Amino acid sequence: MTGTPAQVGRHGPTRRRVLTTALAAGAAALGAGALSGCGSALAADDGSTVRLWDPFSGADGGLLNEMVAKAQPDMPGTRVERTVLEWGTPFYTKLAMASSGGRGPDVAVSHMSRLAGYAPTGLLDPWDTDLLAEYGIARDDFADAVWSRTQFDGQTYAVPLDTHPFIVFYHPGPAKKAGLLTADGTLDADAFSSPDRFLAAGKELAKASGKQGIAFGYVTDTAQCWRLFYGLYRQTGGRFELREGGPAEVDVDRMAEVISFMAKVVDGTVNPKHLDYASAIASFVNKQTAMTLSGEWELGTYRAADKNVGAAPFPTVFGTPAVYADSHSFVLPHRDHPDEEHRRRTHRAVAALLKAGQVWATAGHIPAYQPVTRTTAYARLEPQAHYAQAASHVVLDPSVWFAGAGSDFQNAMSQVLQQALLGDMTPDRAARAMVRRLNTFLSKPSPA
């Protein structure tokens, strides 16, 4: 997720809670870098306030407050005022409505996967990359896999804050006993480098733990099956081109191959079969399983249960490195006549927040601003540093208006995949059902 059940379907129930009106309307001030709620994005002030809308409550919200405080020396005379909104459809609906009427905040946090539904419609304004460069933020500071998704018609419509990939967590004890760790104590990726090896590793983990091997929570979830499927499918090198009007250009045989593998991972023998999101978390926290397939946004939960919990990028099972992910990014809601000096202030504030990314990294998110991940301080973060390389191989949702975090598209794909994983549909039938649903989405006109 972030979006991290917080962000993220990611972003799920363990990290995002419905916010009360009071929380959305007000928060504590942080001195010169004040954090507060606001009733109106355009309320009068002396021009020193940069208003930010974001979906971060709970632990992530606290970390963003810390980032604002840490960033203050790099944005003197500026205060950041946050308004926290419920993540998901309510957040994006309110952002779209406010932007269309020119009443949005100065800056907002959006999932990168939703950009294709916003940038082409005129709801967002592009960033001034020359201005960002004045404050030390350059295109080369970001991984190609992430930065490439910020572009539309040759302009930059998002500035990435993080990458939040779908990875693997493991308990070091049974992983070591199963012979699945390297000499330096990290996960042996080669042991998971094909479907057969992955399944064999799951059996070894089950033997070593005396319980079960790998947990994956997906039942009734609106995104989990899609995350696992799309990352694996992109590892096959198969086409997934979605042109407006359709039909979808995909490799049905490779789709079926991936679905077949997914079903074997949760076949109910060495790995649990019918786990929902919360049950998968519980099975790993309680050490009923030795490994879990999960978003990095659950690091806090897992580390609270096992301070030595290990993590690694999702293994390359089908030949080509690819890790499903999304990215929290800063976007500029459209203004018909933006104040140039205030836009400069907004650019400076975002640059300052990016440079304070070490704070954000403590939650498990990979800072998108790579000068942060190259520091000695970041290298000391474990297990974060062990999966940071995932940022170089991330794949986001297809760049189409109907896809992205919290979308009906993810839910529709996940519902079909769930039927296959529960044994109610063959992999081939599931693949073809997904294609039919893809074509239905493609037949709908883009709002742009």
Regions found by a protein language model. Give the residues of each.
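Paired acidic/hydrophobic, glycine-rich loop segments that form the ligand-binding mouth/hinge
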Residues: 106-109, 290-295
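Hinge/lid segment of periplasmic solute-binding proteins
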Residues: 112-167, 225, 392
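Extracytoplasmic/periplasmic solute-binding protein
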Residues: 153-161, 166, 193-247
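Long, aromatic- and glycine/proline-rich binding clefts that accommodate carbohydrate-like moieties
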Residues: 307, 312, 362-415, 419, ...
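Glycine-centered hinge/linker elements that transmit conformational signals in sensory
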Residues: 197-204, 243-274
